[in-house]
């Protein structure tokens, strides 16, 4: 399996909370934490790609014991600056292979984190790694955007996802290989700076099969944290898989 690259180092980590401020809003975070706390129950939770603690810190404040995995030492350094971070143990590594002490009633990977693993093998390995950490009956939650292929004109591979005065974003699709590269152009003091991040998009049925290979079964499938039904028009999947007993 290919080495996973840290795409969140340096300035990206330093500016992450500010550039993603809308994701930290109470109306976004609270339904997320409600959903996860319910599944965790009296047990502990493991967050894959814990980042700067957007979800882990408020979940810990709810009384859920939380551990985390993240590849980016710089993102974890930002987490460590925040109140309550001392209660969260973080292992540096990728979601497909990093090992954490103990077992958990809940593991979760939100905000397209599964897509940061850019091969099918790595995504399958992620499910298998989670299964090793879950107690029997424990749940794995994956949140991922649905591929926006319906809006991609035939023969085209680029689609803009954000046009602003200081940021331009374009997705580049490789439909044959389920590949996606997000290209960012950000206006800095020294001028426009370009960066790109690769992803591998996934479909719900494919995730179900990955879970099956890891000894899990589907439990819930929603379009958001408030348990709205998942349909063909849904832009996001909130999937829950349960480790077989």
Task: Give a label for each model feature.
Residues 141-210:
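SAM-dependent methyltransferase
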Residues 99-106:
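A short acidic, Gly/Pro-enriched loop at the edge of an enzyme's catalytic core
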Residues 124-136:
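A short glycine-rich, Lys/Arg-flanked "PGG" loop and its adjoining helix->strand segment in the class I
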Residues 1-51:
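Conserved class I S-adenosyl-L-methionine
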Residues 206-245:
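C-terminal lobe and adjacent flexible extensions of AdoMet/dcAdoMet transferase-like proteins
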């Amino acid at each position: 399996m290919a080495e996973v690259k840290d795409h969140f180092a340096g300035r990206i980590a330093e500016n992450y909370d500010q550039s993603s401020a809308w994701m930290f809003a109470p109306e976004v975070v609270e339904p997320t934490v409600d959903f996860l706390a319910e599944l965790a129950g009296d047990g502990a939770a493991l967050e894959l790609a814990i980042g700067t603690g957007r979800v882990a810190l408020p979940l810990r404040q709810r009384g859920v014991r939380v551990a985390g995995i993240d590849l980016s030492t710089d993102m974890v350094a930002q987490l460590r600056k925040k109140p309550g971070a001392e209660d969260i143990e973080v292992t540096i590594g990728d979601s497909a292979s990093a090992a954490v002490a103990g077992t958990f009633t809940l593991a979760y990977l939100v905000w397209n984190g599964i897509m940061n693993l850019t091969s099918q093998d790595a995504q399958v390995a992620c499910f298998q790694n989670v299964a090793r950490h879950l107690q029997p009956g424990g749940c794995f939650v994956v949140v991922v955007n649905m591929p926006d292929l319906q809006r991609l004109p035939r023969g085209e591979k680029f689609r803009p996802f954000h046009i602003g005065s200081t940021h331009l974003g374009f997705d580049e699709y490789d439909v044959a290989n389920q590949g996606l590269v997000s290209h960012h152009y950000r206006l800095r003091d020294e001028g426009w700076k370009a960066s790109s991040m690769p992803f591998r998009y996934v479909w719900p049925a494919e995730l179900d099969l990955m879970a099956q290979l890891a000894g899990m079964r589907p439990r819930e499938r929603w379009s958001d944290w408030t348990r709205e039904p998942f349909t063909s028009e849904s832009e996001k999947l909130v999937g829950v898989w349960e480790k077989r007993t």
